[in-house]
Every structure is written in structure tokens, then in C-alpha cells.
Regions:
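N-terminal small/glycine-rich loop or linker at the start of catalytic domains
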Residues: 1-8, 66-78
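Histidine-acidic metal/acid-base catalytic patches
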Residues: 1-4, 9, 16-29, 154-173, ...
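Acidic (Asp/Glu)-rich catalytic clusters
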Residues: 21-27, 45-67, 94-103, 134-139, ...
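Glycine-rich, proline-tolerant flexible connector loops at the mouths of alpha/beta enzymes
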Residues: 34-57, 111-117
Length: 270
């Protein structure tokens, strides 16, 4: 079973420059990455930057399987102001093109957050974005994978999956968010549309993004569900180093993470 690691693993602690961090991912046994840099910024990659990142990934001996889309607190998929939603649209188009250029097949996006009792205005507002990027996604072979983020996300995910075909819209499962929100049972029903994975552990309280078995997630249940789903890509881990939890250096954290990952994928499934 092949595995993948998120590219922003050290962005919030050691801040290792791109070329070096890609190299050490490969040195510790990873062959695949999920691109998660700039996931919460308004950075638009230039064609020169896209070519550079693509070359760095290839030179490191890695393959990018999918890309995290980007947004900010105001530049959202359901932004009420057209100018802000247009900015979101530009960012999403940029990441779709980037994903295609680096060899990925899916861009992960966050659904709108419920604002008030009625969810439908935000969901309907977001449809403008899907309609605008659909042709680009189809031309480049990119799927939009809706990530579970909040307790009410099953409603949003169902809304999008019912409205659009699997070639265009799929599901990104985030184990940490599901554990905090207590909605894994509801999310299991989306296994047929599983297109991307954000696997990481926590203790049910904070979004700690730690390796398997660090927290209290039932990893055997998750592995069984993934194997029963239609997911066919490398298993991706959205693990990020936090010096509050691990005092060693980057190499030691990668060794610890890879050991936990190997334990996870080797779990016996009844």
C-alpha cells in the first residue's frame, strides 16, 4: 500500500525551504505528496512558479497526487460580495491548473460554513463557483474533492455529490475533523465518492494533525472503511510537526511519522 505526505508538514515549525523538505520526504521513504502549501492564503502561482514547483517535485523523485485549494476568512466559496467570490474563483482556477501541471487529479476544497439556521443560501451561492470551473476541470481531468470540516458538513457534501457527477465532484475525508465533530458514521456513506484523504490523529478536542496512534482515533475502523471504498490512490497523511508535541528534529519526526504510518497500513482487518 503506497503512502503520501502533506507538503506543509514543517511549514509551521522548522519552516524548511521547498527543495530541502521535498528531498527529506523522499529520503524517509515517501514517493508521493499532497500539495498543501499556501492552503489558506491569497497567493496565485505564476506560470514560472508552477514550472519551478513541478521541477522540484520531479527532481526529488516524488509524485503529487492531489492539491489543497486555498481560501481565506473573507475570500470564500460562498462570499456574498461578487468581488470576493471572484477572487476565490481565480484562486481555485489557479490551483486546478497547478494540480494538472504537477500530475495530480483532485483539488480539495472546503464547503461553506453554516451561517445561521438556514444552510441553503450559502450552498446555492457556492454553485456559481462550481459552474464556472466545471469546464476547466473536465478539460484537465481534475475532480473537486469536498472536505469534511465542520459538524454540519454531511448536508453540504450530500448536496454537492447529489448535484454533480463523480468525475467532477468527490469527497475528501479528514479523519481529524471527523473525530472532533463526531460524525464519522455519517461520513462513511460517502465512500463510493472518496477521492482524497487527510489522515491525522488527535484526542477529540483540538485539530492536532499528529501521526496515527498519537491520539484516540479508531484507526482499524478507518482502514477497513478505506479498503471497502473505491479509493485507489496512495494513502495520504496530513501530519504537521508541532514542537509542543515532539521535541526532536525534522528527520526524527519523519522517522516517527513513517513508523506510525507503517503500523497503520499493516493493521489486521477482520
Amino acid at each position: 500500500m503506497d503512502v503520501s505526505i502533506t507538503s506543509d508538514m514543517f511549514n509551521y515549525s522548522f519552516k524548511i525551504e521547498m527543495k530541502k523538505k521535498l528531498r527529506i520526504f523522499a529520503e524517509h521513504g515517501f514517493k508521493y505528496i499532497h500539495w498543501c502549501d499556501d492552503w489558506n492564503s491569497d497567493v496565485v502561482y505564476s506560470q514560472k512558479e508552477i514550472r519551478r514547483y513541478s521541477q522540484l517535485i520531479e527532481t526529488a523523485g516524488l509524485r503529487c497526487i492531489d492539491v489543497h485549494g486555498t481560501a481565506t476568512s473573507s475570500i470564500r466559496i460562498d462570499a456574498e460580495e461578487d468581488a470576493l467570490q471572484d477572487q476565490y474563483l481565480r484562486l481555485l482556477e489557479n490551483r486546478i491548473e497547478f494540480c494538472s501541471s504537477v500530475g495530480g487529479d483532485a483539488v480539495v476544497i472546503h464547503p461553506p460554513r453554516r451561517r445561521g439556521k438556514d444552510y441553503s443560501p450559502s450552498l446555492k451561492r457556492s454553485l456559481r463557483v462550481f459552474e464556472k470551473v466545471r469546464r476547466l476541470c473536465e478539460e484537465l481531468g481534475i475532480t473537486l474533492a469536498i472536505e469534511n470540516c465542520f459538524p454540519e458538513d454531511e448536508e453540504a457534501i450530500s448536496f454537492y455529490l447529489d448535484k454533480f457527477p463523480p468525475e467532477f465532484v468527490g469527497f475528501c475525508f479528514d479523519s481529524g475533523h471527523a473525530h472532533i465533530n463526531g460524525n464519522f458514521d455519517q461520513l462513511m456513506g460517502f465512500g463510493e465518492r472518496l477521492k482524497a484523504l487527510h489522515l491525522h490523529d488527535n484526542k477529540g478536542e483540538k485539530d492536532d494533525h499528529q501521526p496515527p496512534f498519537w491520539g484516540t482515533i479508531d484507526w482499524k475502523r478507518i482502514l477497513r472503511w478505506i479498503k471497502d471504498s473505491r479509493y485507489a490512490k496512495p494513502i495520504n497523511f496530513e501530519i504537521t510537526h508541532n514542537p509542543e508535541f515532539f521535541s526532536g528534529n525534522a528527520d526524527e519526526y519523519l522517522e516517527y511519522s513513517m513508523s506510525a504510518i507503517q503500523k497503520f497500513i499493516s493493521l489486521p482487518i477482520d
